[in-house]
Amino acid sequence: MTLEAIRYSRGSLQILDQLLLPQQSRYEAVGSVRQAWEAIRAMKVRGAPAIALVGCLSLAVELQAGAGGPGLAALVAFVQDALSFLVTARPTAVNMARAARDLADLAAQEAEREGATEEAVRERVICWAEDMLDKDLRDNRSIGDLGAHHLLKRAAPQGGKVTVLTHCNTGALATAGYGTALGVIRSLHNLGRLEHAFCTETRPYNQGARLTAFELVYEQIPATLIADSMAAAAMAHQGVSAVVVGADRVVANGDTANKVGTYQLAIAAKHHGIPFYVAAPSSSCDLRLETGREIVIEERPDQELTDVNGVRIAAPGIGVWNPAFDVTPHDLITGGIITELGVFAPEELQAALSATIS
């Protein structure tokens, strides 16, 4: 049985409430764009690809139920307004913003066709959102396979197995399935070339301890959980061959926004001479931004750092800074950026993808 973060059939969308994992596996119905926004904001669903999928599919559910209209102009306005609203839930991840732009443009173009009808435009928008699921899964499998083979050539050129360290959650729970960085680990395991995986707990939201560890145990992949503060020691003493992380936004020069804590992993990996990889679909690449300094970093509520499961663990009155992401400079991404289109050095990324994305 495969883990599913998203369950969808025409007119029905359910998400696995990831706030309850690993203690409970409970699916929650999402029947509107507003409900999707709230689920994304609360991090019941998370991971850049999954955010875009849930956002667009929630719109498809509303459209299937008859929302929008009457008339082409009103329908297009409804689609565009809904998509703009969804982008505000978690703005650092680019996938939702790109999907919103593309889908809004599609709706407008379809409405301008000669003989266009409200029913035809509605159907076209729904189908586009549904196609995202299949494409994401295909892309993730490509990322996993391309990344695994590139990593093996770099880290184990004489053969043998590798040990990989990863951060946050980038598996089936963050995507339509298989995963990005965790997909690379999965592919290595399927090839019989994975010695061991290390996953960080990923404070303050513990996505590594709650979600990645859950996936690794579920898939019976040999793995060990470590605290974030143990990563450099693991590189020094546990035979780590490579670090592979995901991304919420990769910009034109290769600077990468990912879960906070990624930057320090890249610094430690470079110090130890360990290749550091970013695994992300091309939909996570934003070539309109030149450097990471332009990325807007989301800041989360204080309570996510001061409280654990509703119990306060920090001294009352202490100040809190809680950014959800940090930016890893491109020169620290020494292994490469793994996409479904290939593995590229940061300086190669813009030329490689410019014909495909913007």
Swiss-Prot record:
Catalytic reaction list: 5-(methylsulfanyl)-alpha-D-ribose 1-phosphate = 5-(methylsulfanyl)-D-ribulose 1-phosphate
A molecular-function term among this protein's GO annotations: S-methyl-5-thioribose-1-phosphate isomerase activity
Marked site positions, Transition state stabilizer: 168
InterPro entries: IF-2B-related, IF-M1Pi, IF_2B-like_C, Initiation_fac_2B_a/b/d, M1Pi_N, NagB/RpiA_transferase-like
Localization annotation: Cytoplasm; Nucleus
Keyword line: Acetylation, Amino-acid biosynthesis, Cytoplasm, Isomerase, Methionine biosynthesis, Nucleus
Enzyme Commission number: 5.3.1.23
Catalytic residues as annotated in Swiss-Prot or TrEMBL: 248
Family, as annotated: Belongs to the eIF-2B alpha/beta/delta subunits family. MtnA subfamily.
Its job: Catalyzes the interconversion of methylthioribose-1-phosphate (MTR-1-P) into methylthioribulose-1-phosphate (MTRu-1-P).
UniProt-listed PANTHER family: METHYLTHIORIBOSE-1-PHOSPHATE ISOMERASE
Protein name (record): Methylthioribose-1-phosphate isomerase
Organism: Bos taurus
